[in-house]
Amino acid sequence: MTNELTFNSDWFTHNVPALEAIMADLKPSKILEIGSFEGRSTVFFLENMLNIHDKVEIHCIDSWLGGREHIQSGWDMNGVERQFEENIRTFLHSFNEKKECKVVKRKGYSHAKMIELLAQGYENYFDFIYVDGSHEATDVLFDALLAHRLVRGGG
């Protein structure tokens, strides 16, 4: 295990300015992330939440099978999933131990996993939901509809 985070792609950083403003305004302590890939956005959210709260929670939904763009580009999705796990493990070993940080990996398709969360009583639970899973229009719409049920009022 290394002590450094490793990311082989960056489809996230361009979102940081807008997300920093959202984080500063909402101050979420419970996030649902749809699409985690190697964990770059997961780490961003954890760092931001831990700057504000002593107890944080993030649920990460991803199939780690890849979308059309990953398959066409020849991504090793098993390797991507392993990198996610390594990055989260590395991050968790590096943060302030006086704070409580819960990361829940939920492997599977977002629609099924979000319905599962609803069935488990997570309706109106999350402060913020980040949707960056499938890039197919119908999938994104369904993710947004389910997210509406899972996010708390004002989130």
Cite the ranges covered by each PLM segment.
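S-adenosylmethionine/decaboxylated-SAM
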Residues: 3-5, 10, 14-155
